[in-house]
Amino acid sequence: RQSPSEMRSSNLAKVLARDKKLQQIASRINKVANDVEAVVMPAIVGMDSQEAVSFIRDRVQKPLHFIATMPPSVPGVRVQTLLRKYFANLGGVYMLGNRVTGGCIEDGRLRYVETSLLPDERLEASDFVLATGSFTSDGLKSNYECVYEPIFHLDVTAPADRMQWVSTSVFDDQPYLHYGVRVNALQQVQKEGHTISNLYAAGAVLGGHNAA
């Protein structure tokens, strides 16, 4: 061990990506797990695919289960990788590091968006999905006066009174965790009380969604 980062789950998963290493781990588990009903180990197997998980489960003689580790999450990275591949197979283009900075809303529709890495390009589409997350991913922001959605300045579910944003006890359910953009039954967002017909919201940016 040269540094603490070597013990991160993602680093361990890279080491355990080889069948030889997984076989060694399985053999050692089998030697000490004779009198147990099941084996539980950290989720540090299968960064890129499910194959490594299936490989070690087939070789451990007891039911093998995985529990989550501290971030980064190996299963989470795997799911993200698979979703990106599936998205690409459907014809999607993933622009790593690019951020939507704004757009043009006219006549109740989002006409195009502008991005940080393509400042001179307008990205047009018939429909758009807003999935920017909550406060931790900057999908929502706040200042001393209000909670707001920073890209299109959409309507949000937060009250104007700042004193209502938090509970006095840190152990209570915090109201701000439920804030998000206001949508209708079709998940279409609203701005100044008017529905944007081709802009939909999904995930933690939705009002009522508690990301915690």
Regions found by a protein language model. Give the residues of each.
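Residues forming the flavin
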Residues: R1-A212
